[in-house]
Amino acid sequence: MLKSQFQQKKMTRNYTGAWQKTPGRLLGIFLIRFYQITLSSLIGNQCRHAPTCSEYIYEAIARHGLWAGAWMGLFRIMRCGPFGTDGFDPVPPSLGHSCCFYKPWRYWKISDKHNK
């Protein structure tokens, strides 16, 4: 029998799809994982969304890079407050043509369009 038949996939709460391992993405992923392992375990799950904010930022950075992912994550955290949104809020698979690095406020609009 093949060894691969008996291997189980490692279960993780973070994005498991393929992503380019650039220095910026690796730095962002490292910081998010550091938060998840240290502070998040002490604080507990306080997020009102699924996936949680740290999982969302992890996936946003992995899919869209450090700059776009960090802005999307910041706007997600701003939406997660007591008077913000809740429920299922996934990372959009693509950003669209209106998003560019010198207009970071447009990353807020991506999440709004994706949720509707």
UniProtKB/Swiss-Prot annotation:
This is Putative membrane protein insertion efficiency factor. PANTHER family: MEMBRANE PROTEIN INSERTION EFFICIENCY FACTOR-RELATED. Belongs to the UPF0161 family. Keywords: Cell inner membrane, Cell membrane, Membrane. Could be involved in insertion of integral membrane proteins into the membrane. It is found in: Cell inner membrane. GO terms for cellular component: plasma membrane. It comes from Bartonella tribocorum (strain CIP 105476 / IBS 506). It is a peripheral membrane protein.
